């Protein structure tokens, strides 16, 4: 008879040192203890109405290693305190050094439906082949031109321009060669191919040098001729203006010969001697009566 009675009697809970009733020193208040796990560790987020010995559902096999460090290291130390206003204060929890789970490469099963970057790299399409070939050719051409590229200077924007190409050195001729070329040019402005070759051979020059020299000399001759003609035209224009001015001044300074007919008529004589450009009218000679 005593065995069934003892079986029906619930097992008393173990005293908890951090229970709310012990913190408040009020054993009369009914407070449910925090749920505990199978190994006696309490859980902070346990159900409020759960049984003391109830445990959370076990993790699947793939997640078994994820919770092992936490179970081995024990539970967090929970210290619940009730403020005078009735608010439960939960301090910040710091996990133990051994409670941080190590990285598990095989803990989560890979999802075959989601393609990864490595799997996309193995795919080949016709347009991808042409793009790769084009990029490869461009990189090859850039690598081939790298040794010949000119480095740009750092400084003012106008100084960052690529320097111009180096010009070829100017060919210098001797005085004897220049003298012979000038003599031939004064006699003949244009040379035939055979004449040019013979002249180049006699002066120990190349055919291209003789041809280039004659082209430059003709250009210089045309420019000089145009300048000389312009100077002659301006000189002739100045000479004509000077002659016109002298003739006009001579016509003004020459005295007017009186007409014999006007000598016997005072009115006609006065009109003949009238000079409107004269400012001083006193210079007009007086009319004398010849009657």
From Swiss-Prot:
DNA-binding region: 166-225
Keyword Nucleus attributed: yes
Keyword annotations of the record: Developmental protein, DNA-binding, Homeobox, Nucleus
UniProt cross-references to PROSITE patterns, sorted A to Z: HOMEOBOX_1 (PS00027), HOMEOBOX_2 (PS50071)
Pfam families attached to this UniProt entry: Homeodomain
Domain of life: Eukaryota
Record localization: Nucleus
GO terms classed as biological process: central nervous system development; GABAergic neuron differentiation; negative regulation of neuron differentiation; neuron differentiation; neuron fate specification; neuron migration; regulation of respiratory gaseous exchange by nervous system process; respiratory gaseous exchange by respiratory system
Region feature Disordered, mapped onto this chain: 1-51
One GO CC term, this protein: nucleus
Residue ranges the record marks as coiled coil: none
UniProt cross-references to SUPFAM superfamilies, sorted A to Z: Homeodomain-like
GO molecular function: DNA-binding transcription factor activity, RNA polymerase II-specific; sequence-specific double-stranded DNA binding
Keyword Cell inner membrane (UniProt): no
PANTHER family (alphabetical): IP01054P, T-CELL LEUKEMIA HOMEOBOX PROTEIN 3
The protein's name in its UniProt record: T-cell leukemia homeobox protein 3
